[in-house]
Amino acid sequence: MKATVLAGLAAVIAAQGVAGHATFQQLWVDGEDKISACARLPLSNSPVTDVNSAEIACNANSGPAAEKCTVSAGGVVTVEMHQQPGDRSCDNEAIGGNHWGPVLVYMSKVDDSATADGSGGWFKIFEDTWAPAPNSNSGSDDYWGVKDLNAHCGRMDVPIPADLAPGDYLLRAEVIALHTASSPGGAQFYMTCYQLTVDGEGSQSPQTVSFPGAYSPSDPGIQINIYQKLTEYVSPGPAVIEGGTTVEAGTGGSTIPAN
């Protein structure tokens, strides 16, 4: 009987994990839906789990997109995540299965965003991570970036820093799911890279990190038990750059109406 119960529980957990797989698929620029024109879509909705893999940059098997999306420095892009390719229904969670964790966005200055391979330097422009909920005794009951994403049809508004130098960039949108992250290798990384051209007259050229290299499996924001009471959450990777955006979890999302 005990073995049967344990096997059943394992099956439920496994099914929950698969149900929660997702990808960032679409992009909006200042409220205009660009669909997936400039998204380097992964071939599956499965996560990357090895932070030392080359796939941690722009996901697995993600070839160049059809186009580049143009945005002005100081403008807003909206990244959009869903569980299944082509499904933009707001009736389904963007990423289900209690895949709580942060939403992080990076950019990389490149010569040509249509051909860049993601191996260049990255800087963080946005994060919506964690905040404590009143009377919570478990991190899973707290506020998370993923919960903000789910509450807004998978969409998250991401301001482009106003002083960013013009040119081509890759934009890397990422969810780190922490539901099985209490041991090394348990965190799940869901990312997509978008091909951008940034217009403007800025001059900001931030310091960068590399993917792989920016994360370690034992980083406190990657190896963490979110089912215990949390008093803090340390966001993985570098700090958000000057002029970037840090959103308090529970307040993030998008102003684009649900369809």
Swiss-Prot record:
<keyword id="KW-0560">Oxidoreductase</keyword>
<keyword id="KW-0732">Signal</keyword>
<dbReference type="Pfam" id="PF03443">
    <property type="entry name" value="AA9"/>
</dbReference>
<feature type="binding site">
    <location>
        <position position="179"/>
    </location>
    <ligand>
        <name>O2</name>
    </ligand>
</feature>
<comment type="function">
    <text>Lytic polysaccharide monooxygenase (LPMO) that depolymerizes crystalline and amorphous polysaccharides via the oxidation of scissile alpha- or beta-(1-4)-glycosidic bonds, yielding C1 or C4 oxidation products. Catalysis by LPMOs requires the reduction of the active-site copper from Cu(II) to Cu(I) by a reducing agent and H(2)O(2) or O(2) as a cosubstrate.</text>
</comment>
<feature type="signal peptide">
    <location>
        <begin position="1"/>
        <end position="20"/>
    </location>
</feature>
<keyword id="KW-0186">Copper</keyword>
<keyword id="KW-0119">Carbohydrate metabolism</keyword>
<dbReference type="GO" id="GO:0030245">
    <property type="term" value="P:cellulose catabolic process"/>
</dbReference>
<keyword id="KW-0503">Monooxygenase</keyword>
<dbReference type="InterPro" id="IPR005103">
    <property type="entry name" value="AA9_LPMO"/>
</dbReference>
<keyword id="KW-1015">Disulfide bond</keyword>
<keyword id="KW-0479">Metal-binding</keyword>
<comment type="similarity">
    <text>Belongs to the polysaccharide monooxygenase AA9 family.</text>
</comment>
<keyword id="KW-0624">Polysaccharide degradation</keyword>
<keyword id="KW-0964">Secreted</keyword>
<feature type="disulfide bond">
    <location>
        <begin position="69"/>
        <end position="193"/>
    </location>
</feature>
<feature type="binding site">
    <location>
        <position position="99"/>
    </location>
    <ligand>
        <name>Cu(2+)</name>
    </ligand>
</feature>
<feature type="binding site">
    <location>
        <position position="188"/>
    </location>
    <ligand>
        <name>O2</name>
    </ligand>
</feature>
<dbReference type="GO" id="GO:0046872">
    <property type="term" value="F:metal ion binding"/>
</dbReference>
<protein>
    <recommendedName>
        <fullName>AA9 family lytic polysaccharide monooxygenase E</fullName>
        <ecNumber>1.14.99.56</ecNumber>
    </recommendedName>
</protein>
<dbReference type="InterPro" id="IPR049892">
    <property type="entry name" value="AA9"/>
</dbReference>
<dbReference type="GO" id="GO:0005576">
    <property type="term" value="C:extracellular region"/>
</dbReference>
<feature type="binding site">
    <location>
        <position position="190"/>
    </location>
    <ligand>
        <name>Cu(2+)</name>
    </ligand>
</feature>
<feature type="binding site">
    <location>
        <position position="21"/>
    </location>
    <ligand>
        <name>Cu(2+)</name>
    </ligand>
</feature>
<keyword id="KW-0136">Cellulose degradation</keyword>
<dbReference type="GO" id="GO:0004497">
    <property type="term" value="F:monooxygenase activity"/>
</dbReference>
